[in-house]
């Protein structure tokens, strides 16, 4: 069988490519039974709908906003972010650096003093200065206090590496940088000013994030699921799968770079070596259904302290009441890991205990649903090897007419909106 464009992976990036190819001949090959990648939901026997962690639509592009509204129509709600940090036994608003109000007085003054000192000493400092690692950037941008109580411990917990080895290439607009006035205002008043790229978000009213995928795939007839790729012959332009061979003109890959390098026959040694230098963080996504309504009024909470094994927890009912049966609540808890040794059962037990110690769960709460989703590839690590390794691999793939896109195909920190736009843009290169 010969196809103009073969798309590897049915996540949102791959689906976007197919959607924007319109009437051209293509096929999506997806290894799972359902498309969506990490942008999908599961429904358990009790009627709880769980996403693969919090999948919220932070949309800036007019095009993507128009597309999402076209697909979901009335099944779309705009939410104002209500996110918090739990540390020092108190809740403070997100972002930490602009909302110190509620913390012990000593910590507030330590954070303000450090911030002022950083501003005085580093007035010419630029995020674009590549000589700085993320650790240095935190100290130069926020000072010792804010770095000590949130930026350093939280990011060490998320990335699972020494953040002195983390570059600043991923930052973009993801880390809010408040002014001195905003820091002081947020230190002495309960300031609800929305700061950051995710101050608002869209989310489906019904069906979880899966509803976006369901509407998108209605416009994409060329989808094959349960397809396992065994090898790719770039000289003959053939993809070999468990259901036969497929000859292509263009190959678009959204699968993780280390995985596609393994699949290609005769990969040069320098490309193999570059692939082995790529690093990433995995996430264990624990979902719980609780027989109590309104366990929290928050969207999600960050946990920077080491005593908690998770870095973030969110509450589905506050995205949409349709995600929980009547009289119940549900939540997702995210635990990042690299080379996990602890069993899922032990991690679940510890997580429940820590949620109780933070008084999010009560000792009397009855957990009526548990769903653990393992995400092997979750966050790309930006270290000193990423840029050169990525360039080596992508140059090789491009030379062989393979377009590698998306979070893991492009090996980058990106959003659902980014994936949709990149999928659209990629179609311009497919002839």
PLM feature segments, named:
Residues 248-250, 258-403:
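C-terminal segments that line or cap access tunnels to active or ligand-binding sites in enzymes
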């Amino acid at each position: 069988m010969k196809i103009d464009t073969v798309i590897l992976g049915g996540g949102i990036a791959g689906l976007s490519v197919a959607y924007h190819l319109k009437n051209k001949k293509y096929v999506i090959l997806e290894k799972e039974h359902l498309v969506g990648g990490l942008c999908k939901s599961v429904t358990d026997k009790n009627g709880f709908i769980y996403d693969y962690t919090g999948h919220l639509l932070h949309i800036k592009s007019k095009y993507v906003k128009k597309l999402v509204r076209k697909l979901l129509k009335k099944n779309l709600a705009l939410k104002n972010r209500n996110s918090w940090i739990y540390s020092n036994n108190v809740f403070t608003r997100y972002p930490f650096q602009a909302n110190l109000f509620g913390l012990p007085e000593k910590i507030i003054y330590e954070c303000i003093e450090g911030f002022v000192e950083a501003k005085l000493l580093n007035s010419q400092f630029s995020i674009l200065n590549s000589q700085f690692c993320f650790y240095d950037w935190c100290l130069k941008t926020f000072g010792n206090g804010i770095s000590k109580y949130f930026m350093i411990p939280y990011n060490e917990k998320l990335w699972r590496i020494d953040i002195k080895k983390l570059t600043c290439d991923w930052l973009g607009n993801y880390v809010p940088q408040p002014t001195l006035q905003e820091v002081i205002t947020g230190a002495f008043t309960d300031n609800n000013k929305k700061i950051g790229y995710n101050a608002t978000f869209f989310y489906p009213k019904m069906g979880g994030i899966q509803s976006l995928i369901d509407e998108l795939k209605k416009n994409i007839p060329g989808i094959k699921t349960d397809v396992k790729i065994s090898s790719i012959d770039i000289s003959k332009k053939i993809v070999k799968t468990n259901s036969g061979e497929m000859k292509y003109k263009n190959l678009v890959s959204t699968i993780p770079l280390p995985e596609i390098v393994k699949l290609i026959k005769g990969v040069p040694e320098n490309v193999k070596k570059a692939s082995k230098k790529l690093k990433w963080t995995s996430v264990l996504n624990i979902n719980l259904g609780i027989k109590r309504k309104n366990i929290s009024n928050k969207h999600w909470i960050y946990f920077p302290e080491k005593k908690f094994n998770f870095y973030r927890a969110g509450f589905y009912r506050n995205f949409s009441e349709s995600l929980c049966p009547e009289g119940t609540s549900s939540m997702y808890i995210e635990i990042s890991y690299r080379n996990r040794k602890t069993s899922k059962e032990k991690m679940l037990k510890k997580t429940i205990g820590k949620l109780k110690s933070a008084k999010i769960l009560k000792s009397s709460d009855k957990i009526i649903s548990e769903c653990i989703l393992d995400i092997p590839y979750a966050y790309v690590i930006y270290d000193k090897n990423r840029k050169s390794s990525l360039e080596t691999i992508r140059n090789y793939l491009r030379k062989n007419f393979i377009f590698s896109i998306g979070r893991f195909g492009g090996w980058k920190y990106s959003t659902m909106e980014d994936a949709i736009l990149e999928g659209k843009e990629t179609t311009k290169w497919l002839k």
